[in-house]
Amino acid sequence: LLHRVENYRFRDWKDIKHDSDIYNGRLLHNRVGYTLSEKLPMLMGLRAEPWFGTLEEELIQKIPEEGISRNDLFSDYPKGKDNAHIQRSLKSALSNMERQLVVAKQFVDVPNRKRSMAIFKRLHGKVKPLPFDKALTELISRIGPVRLHTLRLFVSRPVEELADTLRELERRGSIARVVALQPDPTDYYSSHEDAERL
């Protein structure tokens, strides 16, 4: 990314990481990344409706508006060797919520502490996801031209739904399909502006 950024100093990272507009979460294909709060509706719109077990339901109700640390979130549950299975279940439930972008983290600088403190913020029910077709159009305009195979890394919906939505967006004129030879003909999806430049 550095070749795309001007006047960036590595010491600026701390300011970026602790900015209240920056979220850390499993954004793409279960990989952890950082994004701006304004991009959350698009990223959430690319995902299917989240699935909740009873433990996930319980945990999400405990997250206040201002967020909560993991220690505080788990504080009401028994600890120790005898309860290791409970702690494993809690970590698994929280990880499941992160994977589905139900929650994301923000980092807070705490005085006299070497590392930043991670605060879990609830996104589900607080941030309204874009409809899938709009989220897909926005994604393509940001990263296109892009192949179907690459789009699958960003979308956690069935590939059939993705292919149907791409066909519908192309039919509506929201996106363009460009065929490139590499060496076989390959479909790329892009905005009309990008398609004209190619």
Regions picked out by a protein language model, each given a short descriptive name:
Residues 1-198:
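Long, low-complexity intrinsically disordered regions
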